[in-house]
Regions:
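Vicinal oxygen chelate
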Residues: 1-2, 67, 76-125
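N-terminal beta-strand motif that seeds the catalytic metal site of vicinal oxygen chelate
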Residues: 1-18, 62-65, 123-125
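Core segments of cupin and vicinal oxygen chelate
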Residues: 4, 10-48
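Short aromatic/hydrophobic contact patches that present stacked aromatics
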Residues: 8-10, 40, 50, 64-66, ...
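Helix N-cap motif at beta-to-alpha junctions
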Residues: 15-16, 69-73
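Short amphipathic alpha-helices within nucleic acid-binding modules
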Residues: 22, 72-78
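Short, charged/polar, Gly/Pro-enriched secondary-structure boundary elements
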Residues: 47-50, 58-59
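Helix-adjacent hinge/juxtasegments
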Residues: 57-70
């Protein structure tokens, strides 16, 4: 029934203008304004992820978007130059280095937050 369906995902933020600036300028993605006060975030496969305002927004406690990259260090360095702060984890099963990159336990990955506090990641392919 849904085999060839163009499903899409969405998430909430508490400030659409900050989200538009972050995803458009900081992340360098195509962001357009949609109907009913939502943003459309264009992703590489031609799909959109919708970003919608929610007055009582609570940030996701899990990674909502993963951005595959060829070189994790280049991506982390570039995003850091653009003001992104990476999350440093120091837990028994989750440790990152001083740059915020977890290495050697699956793909190299670094987590960070958007202005609404939602968790995102860059991970090395």
């Amino acid at each position: 029934m849904f085999k060839n369906n163009k499903a899409f995902s969405g998430f909430s933020v508490n400030n659409l203008q900050k989200a538009k600036e972050f995803y458009g300028k900081t992340m360098g993605m195509e962001v357009t304004e949609g109907e009913m006060g939502i943003l459309n975030l264009k992703i590489a496969n031609g799909s959109n992820v919708i970003i919608y305002p929610k007055p009582n927004h609570t940030p996701a406690t899990f990674t909502i978007l993963n951005f595959p990259v060829k070189n994790i260090d280049e991506a982390v360095n570039e995003l850091a130059k653009r003001g992104v702060r990476f999350i440093i984890y120091n837990q028994p099963n989750l440790k990152t280095d001083e740059k915020g990159v977890m290495r050697g336990n699956g793909p190299n990955i670094a987590w960070f937050k958007d202005p609404a506090g939602n968790i995102l990641s860059v991970l090395e392919e």
